[in-house]
Amino acid sequence: DVFKSLGIDDAKSDMVMDQCLKFAKNYDDINEYEQAAHNILESEGVVDAIPEKLIERAEIIHEQIKKYLKDGLVLDFGCGDARLAQLIAKDGNEVQLADVYENPNVAKTGLPFELLEQGKDIPFEDNKFDNTLLLTVFHHSDDPIQLMKETKRVTKPGGRVIVIESVYDVDGKELSEDERKKSEEYLALSPEQQRRVNIFFDHFYNRVIHNSDDPSKKVNVPFNFNTPEEWKKLFDEQDLKQEEVVHLGPDQPTVPEYHTLHVLNVEK
């Protein structure tokens, strides 16, 4: 379904995956495998199809989160290509971009950008932002708890932190009937199998499809996945009060992980 969403037919999808799996079983260095698999995907047009799908992904997420944004300054932490931030800015919010590397599209947005250092404190003063977005970010952090503390520090009292996370150990009961039907293969898996699916797609999407020769541009993949309940417990411990959780399910065809949206209020 991932390749189908990119316009790749079933026969070619099978061939591409067979080649990638062949490399996966016979590599001496993980970086060599990632590059070899990336080259296969690039030769078959998979990589070139991604940018258009990222526009669709930004539009999907924008619809999911826009009603939760408060008026004022928004920090898009882990902004990626900043396409979502552009949509938020068009709504009238002032947006600050931040990420560990600068995507080529960032400069085209005209929005302010701050280059982050992996594992370092967020380089903004206390109580600066009305909204802080961390959209599929926490599971890429080596220390999600410290990142939560920093997120709370830079967000105003009463401000809002909006999180989307890839989760596991879900049964889909919160989804509509149509959404459950689309997700039935994933939902039939055990919790550990769901976690492993997340690991596979997280690595495949971030380190194979988006492979880079530059070590500083390789996405960090420590696979810090949690269940929705475990995320809530961690948020509570940092006085990030969960006002609402929305089960989005496998809502993004190019990244078919089960997502939940967490709307948090900053208590200080």
Predicted regions and their residues:
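Class I SAM-dependent methyltransferase Rossmann-like catalytic core
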Residues: E34-R57
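Conserved alpha-helix/loop element of class I SAM-dependent methyltransferases that forms part
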Residues: P51-D71
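Conserved class I S-adenosyl-L-methionine
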Residues: D71-G80
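Class I SAM-dependent methyltransferase SAM/SAH-binding core
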Residues: C79-D121
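A conserved beta-strand element that flanks and buttresses the S-adenosyl-L-methionine
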Residues: L133
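Short catalytic micro-motifs in class I SAM-dependent methyltransferases
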Residues: T136-V137, E165
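A short glycine-rich, Lys/Arg-flanked "PGG" loop and its adjoining helix->strand segment in the class I
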Residues: I145-P157
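C-terminal alpha-helical "lid/dimerization" subdomain adjacent to the S-adenosyl-L-methionine
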Residues: I164-Q238, E244-D251
